[in-house]
Amino acid sequence: MSSFNRRTLLTLPLALPAVLAACGFTPAYGPAGPAQGLQGRIRAADPGDKDGFDFVTAVEARFGRSKDPRYALAYAITTEAVGVGFATDTTITRYNLKGRVDWSLTDTESDTRIAGGTAENFTSWSATSATVAAVAAEQDAAKRLMVILADQIAAEILAASVRFSP
């Protein structure tokens, strides 16, 4: 026989905030959170191509469009399409789009690098015999990849904001 107590189970979610507060947890965007000062303060470098445009759009979706930028985000994007699915006649039926972003966040007031690194990921798309559909699928995969990479970088910036938030 188990001594399962439903009341104890139901009160656990109520105790969670107290447990998190006791360990020093502060929401990143909370009133005293370290990332609160990042909204509208990060300016990504101007994009030079479609991938860059999609990447900057995704970064601005996370941190807001820069109104009074204190931090400059420099980045270099590289992508490579690789055939991964093959039919019996050796035609490619599926592609992976591998992407890499080398990035650096600089405090423009002190001109010091405060965070940086490399984000890598991939997306896939199926090849089709219709040219328009194939191009649309490839463009969609590229856009999804830029959003994924921007999310990875945003998470790293949020984690690092404890060290440099104003």
Task: Give a label for each model feature.
Residues 136-166:
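C-terminal/domain-edge helix-coil "capping" segments
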Residues 8-25:
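N-terminal export signals
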Residues 24-28, 50, 164-165:
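Flexible, low-complexity charged segments
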Residues 33-55:
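Post-signal peptide N-terminal segment of mature Sec-exported envelope proteins
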Residues 66-116, 124-140, 151:
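Surface-exposed short loop/turn segments
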Residues 2, 44-46, 51, 61, ...:
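Acidic, proline/glycine-rich low-complexity intrinsically disordered segments
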